Amino acid sequence: MLASACTHSWRTGRFLNRIIKSSVQTLTAAALIANLSACSRPTTLEKIEQEGALHVITRNAPTTYYEDRDGPAGFEYELAKKFSEYLGVELRLRVANDLDEAYTVLEQNYTNLAAVGLSRLAASAQSPSLRFSSEYLEIQPLVLYRNGSAKPKQLDDLIGGKLIIPAQTAQAEFLRQVKDSRLPDMDWLEAADMETSEIMRLIEEGEYEYAIVNSREYEIHKAMFPRAREAFSLMEPLQISWIFPPGEDMSLIQKADEFIKQIKDDGTLIYLQERYFGHVNQLNYVGARTYISHIKDRLPKFEPTFKQAAEKFEVDWRLLASIGYQESHWRPYATSPTGVRGLMMLTLPTAKEMNVKNRLNPEQSIFGGAGYFSRIKQRISERITEPDRTWMALAAYNVGLGHLEDARALAKAQGLDQDKWIDVKQALPLLQQKKWYVKTRYGYARGWEPVHYVQNIRRYYDVLVWMTQPSAEDGSVAQNEDAPTTGADGTTEETPAIPAPFRVTPPML
């Protein structure tokens, strides 16, 4: 009986050993398969490189993306374009109708990143699982009020008034915390389908008393809505980052951080900020209101001539119109004490050079000014690229090509880039100081004048671009996202369908 029991126990032990051994082998094989599978699965960055395309979602706004006469433009667009070039792939852009759509696309992993100009605080409040690049831009949330009404000094002053803010922003989250902690009577409307321009229009027209917007978009739009005035800063400045889908590996985020560090170190980021935001403070309240009024009342009479001259000399008509406004406020009979006359305020020598018989004739003046500007621009060094070439041509139009070249030489002597407007505009004011202008070929010049001249024209031009921006049509840059993509093996595959339609839409002004 004892022997039988021992035999049974021995057989049972052998059976259990076989089971354990088999289980261990199975688990080991499964682990090896999983490990091999993980090793063979391409990273996010590798998939982008294999496809040859970076997929980015953005929104239509002056600080992010818009369609200009020459195609796509905007700070976030430029940044994304440079990142795609850094990766050596094509940029494929989608334009979301609203932030809800952008978040949906991110969460469903239909894009590689979102460049929508939002802070980490705002995006995290909507979806905690989203991930972010390092910061590359700072914005300040501002409280606005309508000029002519009492200026609020603190949040308590907004209680009882009509307040509107953009939805899904850090400002909205901040107000909810304030309401819960100390101001239970605070109420506001969160506008889910409005851009900053529309919100500021509501303040301009008196439909709302207060609004909260970010500083970058306020500065860009304030010339168009001059009654919408800054009251005070709502909270600490916010840092802007790119937003990445949840669940992906870190390869693309790490590459984005490398890129952001590089453009900070080499000056590219400062250059883009100067290009899109470096001139936005040039119009004060009175100047902005006057300009908007003149666009409606004076410009229509001369617009056809500006367009004809622009076509002849291959210049953007809105730039020519902006020059004309800076010179005379579109007054055809303007005359200065120094003898310059007409809508483009031509000097007598310039008029003779351009074969202008009557400087007070608007058509002759516009064609003369356009031809003269075109001639100056052609003399600017060919190695200077746009938009710096245009800004320097404007400076030379104002102060003379010789003085511009002196300023470029001074910039180079100081270790600055003589081919970048952001550096040359620092050197131009030195032409007023004897210790500097005695070293130049052409001597003294009122160097601050061309700096202000260019800044003013850039601001006038921006407003005209936004007020005359064409509606996007089929075939815009946003549509190439739905084109078949080619993989590394040469096969084509359709991009997965997006749950909601996408289109490029002009901003509401």
From Swiss-Prot:
Gene Ontology cellular-component terms listed: cell outer membrane
Top-level EC class: lyase
Free-text comment on this protein's domains from its UniProt entry: The N-terminal domain does not have lytic activity and probably modulates enzymatic activity. The C-terminal domain is the catalytic active domain.
Its membrane topology: Peripheral membrane protein
Role description: Murein-degrading enzyme that degrades murein glycan strands and insoluble, high-molecular weight murein sacculi, with the concomitant formation of a 1,6-anhydromuramoyl product. Lytic transglycosylases (LTs) play an integral role in the metabolism of the peptidoglycan (PG) sacculus. Their lytic action creates space within the PG sacculus to allow for its expansion as well as for the insertion of various structures such as secretion systems and flagella.
Reactions catalysed, as given in the entry: Exolytic cleavage of the (1->4)-beta-glycosidic linkage between N-acetylmuramic acid (MurNAc) and N-acetylglucosamine (GlcNAc) residues in peptidoglycan, from either the reducing or the non-reducing ends of the peptidoglycan chains, with concomitant formation of a 1,6-anhydrobond in the MurNAc residue
Residues covered by region (LT domain): 281-509
Protein localization: Cell outer membrane
SMART domains: PBPb
Residues annotated as the enzyme's active site: 327
Signal peptide extent: 1-40
Matches recorded under PANTHER family: MEMBRANE-BOUND LYTIC MUREIN TRANSGLYCOSYLASE F (PTHR35936:SF32)
Name of the protein in its database record: Membrane-bound lytic murein transglycosylase F
UniProt KW Lyase keyword: yes
S-S bridge residues: none
Matching InterPro entries: Lysozyme-like_dom_sf, MltF, Solute-binding_3/MltF_N, Transglyc_AS, Transglycosylase_SLT_dom_1
